[in-house]
UniProtKB/Swiss-Prot annotation:
Keywords: Chloroplast, Plastid, Ribonucleoprotein, Ribosomal protein. GO terms for cellular component: chloroplast; mitochondrial small ribosomal subunit. This is Small ribosomal subunit protein uS2c. Belongs to the universal ribosomal protein uS2 family. GO terms for molecular function: structural constituent of ribosome. It is found in: Plastid, Chloroplast. It comes from Chloranthus spicatus. One of its GO terms (biological process) is translation. SUPFAM superfamilies: Ribosomal protein S2. It comes from the Eukaryota.
Length: 236
C-alpha cells in the first residue's frame, strides 16, 4: 500500500469534535485501546490513533481509485445523510443515504432487477410516456418511481458489487457491514466508543454523531479517492 501525506491535523479534528465519544456507560470494552480519557461522563477518543487509521484508510482508497476500483458510501441516519450524498457525488462514488434494504448486496440479483425497473421508469418519465397513461396508472408508477429514487437513487449507475464500502456509524449500518463481511468486500468504518473495532477491515475511531466530524472524515477519504482517480484517468 502506498503511504502518502494526507494533511490530517489533530487541531482540525478537535475543532470538529471528532474526539467526543459516547457516555461512559454506553461503551464497548473493545474500544479501550482507542480511548484516551474520560471527561464529564464521556469517553474521549485518542485522536493520534484516529489520525493513524484515517491515514491508512486514505492510502487504501487512493491505491484502489488509482486502479479504477469502485466505491460505495453508506450512511443513512439524518446527521450523516447529506454529508454522505455530497461526498459521494464529489468523488463520483455510489451511495446509500436513506435506508439500506436488506440483501442489497448479498442478494445482488434482486437489487439489479430493482435498478433496471428504476432505469426503465426514469426513461419512461423523461420521454413523457407516464403522462399518456390513465391517471390512476400514472400516479401509481410515479409513486413507485419516487420510492425507487429515494432508496436507489445513489446507486442508480451501479452495475456490480462495489470494491470497497465506506460506512458511517457501525451500529446504524450493521446489516450493511455484515453483508460486506459475508461477501468479502473490504470495509472502512467510522466507529464511536460504543462500537466493535474488529468488524471492519479499517476502523476509524471518531464521533459518528456530529455532522462536522462525519464531514471531516468523509472529506479526507473522498479527497484521497479523487486524487487517486485523477491519476488513473491520466494514465489510461
Amino acid at each position: 500500500m502506498t503511504r502518502r501525506y494526507w494533511n490530517i491535523n489533530l487541531e482540525e479534528m478537535m475543532e470538529a469534535g471528532v474526539h467526543f465519544g459516547h457516555g461512559t456507560r454506553k461503551w464497548n470494552p473493545r474500544m479501550a485501546p482507542y480511548i484516551s480519557a474520560k471527561r464529564k461522563g464521556i469517553h474521549i477518543t485518542n485522536l493520534t490513533r484516529t489520525a493513524r487509521f484515517l491515514s491508512e484508510a486514505c492510502d487504501l482508497v487512493f491505491d484502489a481509485a488509482s486502479s479504477g476500483k469502485h466505491f460505495l458510501i453508506v450512511g443513512t441516519k439524518n446527521k450523516a445523510a447529506d454529508s454522505v450524498a455530497s461526498a459521494a457525488i464529489r468523488a463520483r462514488c455510489h451511495y446509500v443515504n436513506k435506508k439500506w434494504l436488506g440483501g442489497m448486496s448479498t442478494n445482488w440479483s434482486t437489487t439489479e432487477t430493482r435498478l433496471q425497473k428504476f432505469r426503465d421508469l426514469r426513461a419512461e418519465q423523461k420521454m413523457g410516456r407516464l403522462n399518456r397513461l390513465p391517471k390512476r396508472d400514472a400516479a401509481m408508477l410515479k409513486r413507485q418511481l419516487s420510492r425507487l429514487q429515494t432508496y436507489l437513487g445513489g446507486i442508480k449507475y451501479m452495475t456490480g458489487l462495489p470494491d470497497i464500502v465506506i460506512i458511517v456509524d457501525q451500529q446504524e449500518e450493521y446489516t450493511a457491514l455484515r453483508e460486506c463481511v459475508t461477501l468479502g468486500i473490504p470495509t472502512i468504518c467510522l466507529i464511536d466508543t460504543n462500537c466493535d473495532p474488529d468488524l471492519a477491515d479499517i476502523s476509524i475511531p471518531a464521533n459518528d454523531d456530529a455532522i462536522a466530524s462525519i464531514r471531516l472524515i468523509l472529506n479526507k477519504l473522498v479527497s484521497a479517492i479523487c486524487e487517486g482517480r485523477s491519476g488513473y484517468i491520466r494514465n489510461r
